[in-house]
């Protein structure tokens, strides 16, 4: 395992986010398996929230699909692995309020929780199944009139 992944693994163990991920996996009756780079994957997650097909808490990736279906979606796994790194950088569960703030910011700008969410953009929008959305019309007009980039701005 590369040094960066060992650091992520240790950071998420120390900051408690991986333990939280294991508790969420247990609550959702997910079946856990080891994955590459110090990650764990819980498949057949059963709780109704969140509605996403996959999500990450610490070094634990949780998915509603079975292992075969998830393994065939390498870009999604890479996207979720990037979220594990974000947990390490944000000090663990401190990432959650930051993530929700970024999601609200994105929704305010575009009407979509992921399109302008800096965590989703850094993890790779397309890899996570998200698409870029334009600014809401009023915001786009304001951006154009103030000389700021509108539609293509991040």
Residue ranges and their predicted role:
Residues 65, 85-86, 127:
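Activation segment
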């Amino acid at each position: 395992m590369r040094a960066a992944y060992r650091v992520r693994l240790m950071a998420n163990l120390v900051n408690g986010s991986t333990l939280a991920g294991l508790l969420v996996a247990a609550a959702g009756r997910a079946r856990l398996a080891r994955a590459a780079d110090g990650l764990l994957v819980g498949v057949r997650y059963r709780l109704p929230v969140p509605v996403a097909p996959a999500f990450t808490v610490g070094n634990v990736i949780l998915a509603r699909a079975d292992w075969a279906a998830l393994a065939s979606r390498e870009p999604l796994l890479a996207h979720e692995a990037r979220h594990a790194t974000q947990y390490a950088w944000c000090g663990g569960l401190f990432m959650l309020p930051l993530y929700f703030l970024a999601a609200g910011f994105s929704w305010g700008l575009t009407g979509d929780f992921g399109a302008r969410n800096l965590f989703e953009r850094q993890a790779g929008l397309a890899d996570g199944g998200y698409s870029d959305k334009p600014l809401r019309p009023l915001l786009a007009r304001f951006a154009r009139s103030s000389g700021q980039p509108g539609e293509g701005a991040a």
